[in-house]
Design a protein with these regions (language model features):
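Phosphate-binding loop of NTP-binding sites
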Residues: 5, 85-214, 218, 224-230, ...
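Acidic, Mg2+-coordinating active-site environments of NTP-dependent enzymes
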Residues: 64, 68-73, 179-326, 350-351, ...
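Active-site beta-alpha connecting loops in nucleotide-dependent enzymes
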Residues: 42-45, 311-312, 330-405, 454
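Residue-level signal for inorganic ion chemistry
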Residues: 35, 54, 89, 104, ...
Length: 454
């Protein structure tokens, strides 16, 4: 973060002195002299309990929901909502800079699309990106606070659980272009219908300037029904839709990556290669290409830069341990992403394929159907065994069994490990995927300790 006067950073929240602010922090362990410390109340940890210590350690201002003992009143900024205060400060800071920025949202594929955007934009200049999936009221501001005078490009991921959240984030970030990857069933539990999810994702439009490009998936069933503001420039990307502005044709995908041609109605045809397996990642690459080229970046260089993509975290990360190929995809899960991950497993050359799949959360009334379909898709992908983990995954195991798959349903992590030890052997390919709170990442790390090293 570049130094900014407190009265400028905190404008709209309080009348502050023009002291120099060098950072905005929410973790008391990262407090440094000249920072603003923001207190977030939580179920397990309440930031207010650390406010006095933060002030003693050099914080210039404390943003809190109520007065805090040990912090002078003239150094306490009282706000009703810490998240909205973070957004306001980030918006004030964002006004100091003018990078070309892409905002990314959607039900599935946000983080992969963000990483493709980063690969493309980095080919043209210094680029800032959302780290991990820091895409909420804290993560988006923290990304924006990393802007500096020499930032030429940026890509910001925006997530949501409820209506109104994307609007708040996009008005704060004010991207130059937007991407909506697809509309699925993630967060159906909170929003009720896919149509409501569509409305929530379309909120990204409110932060885009007049004439801004908005890249949308032409193959998604709902996005073509969206009402797009006439002041924006929609650019449709896809594989199947013949009328898409940017299409992928001649797609060949395998364990080591995917090749295809980009057919662009505006700029021509380009060869593309990406180091990812699965046709779903082609959509993510197309989205990044479409948004970047409509910001005026050279199309041939954008297409070539897709090859520099690198996988992050436990998102379809393919590794080999003890002679076994693992697809680590433990961060999140929805029916759409399960189907995509199973297609990657199917494409691997290993003789035997095993799926370790856990519960998908926040699906609401679509939960049983989504888990049942996942079991059917596992069978269609030719898995030799399915280990289903969690109460919701019983339907998954039953559906796979009905299709002739050797499937078991586990209620505990120890049961899962027992079946993994029983089923998995060197030479196998194993897909590991579930919602993050199911803890499959930790379970997988435990199993790795049992495998031969080297």
């Amino acid at each position: 973060m570049q130094t900014i006067p407190a009265n400028q950073l905190l404008a709209g929240l309080t009348l502050a002195e023009p002291v120099a602010i060098r950072a905005v922090v929410t973790d008391s362990r990262k407090v440094e002299p000249g920072c603003v410390f923001v207190c977030f109340p939580g179920e397990r940890v309440d930031g207010h309990d650390y406010a006095a210590g933060a002030y003693r350690n050099g914080a210039e201002y404390i943003v809190a929901n109520h007065p805090v003992e040990g912090v002078p009143a003239d150094r306490t900024v009282i706000v009703p909502d810490s998240g909205k205060a973070m957004i306001r400060m980030a918006s004030n800071y964002r006004m100091l800079f003018n990078p070309r920025m892409i905002g990314v949202t959607g039900s599935v594929g946000k983080t992969t699309t963000k990483e493709f955007c980063y690969s493309v934009l980095s080919a043209f200049g210094k680029t800032l990106k959302t780290e991990g999936n820091q895409n909420n009221d804290i993560g988006v501001p923290n990304t924006l606070f990393r802007l500096t005078d020499d930032t030429e490009y940026a890509v910001v991921e925006m997530g949501m659980d409820h209506a109104g959240e994307i609007e708040r984030l996009t008005r704060c970030a004010r991207p130059s272009a937007g991407i909506i990857t697809m509309i699925g069933v993630s967060h159906l539990e909170n929003l009720g219908t896919r149509e409501n999810i569509l409305k929530a994702k379309m909120e990204i439009c409110t932060g885009l300037p007049d004439g801004a490009p908005l890249a949308l998936n032409a193959d998604n069933d709902l996005l073509p029904t969206a009402s797009i503001p006439s002041r924006l420039r929609p650019v449709w990307f896809g594989i199947d839709a013949a009328n898409a502005d940017v299409r992928a044709v001649d797609v060949v995908t395998g364990a080591n990556g995917t090749t295809f041609k980009i057919v662009d109605t505006q700029y021509g045809t380009f060869d593309a290669a990406i180091p990812t397996a699965g046709i779903h990642t082609v959509y993510d690459a197309l989205a990044a290409y479409a948004a970047a080229t409509r910001l005026g970046l050279d199309a041939a260089r954008c297409a070539a830069a897709l090859a520099t993509y690198r996988t992050t975290g436990m998102r379809q990360h393919i590794v080999e341990k003890g002679g076994i190929t693992f697809i680590e995809d433990c961060y999140n899960a929805s029916p759409d992403s399960m189907k995509a991950a199973l297609s990657v497993l199917k494409a691997l050359p290993n003789a035997r394929k095993i799926a370790l799949l856990g519960d998908m959360l926040e699906l609401g009334g679509a939960s049983e159907e989504g888990h049942r379909h996942t079991g059917e898709w596992a069978a269609d992908a030719g898995v030799d065994a399915l280990i289903a983990y969690g109460p919701r995954s019983a339907a998954m195991a039953e559906a796979a069994k009905a299709r002739g798959v050797a499937a078991v349903h586990c209620q505990t992590a120890e049961e899962v490990l027992q079946y993994v030890r029983q089923f998995v052997r060197p030479g196998d390919a194993v897909l590991v995927k579930a919602s993050h709170s199911m803890g499959l990442e930790q379970l997988l790390q435990e199993y790795y300790k049992e495998l031969p090293q080297g």
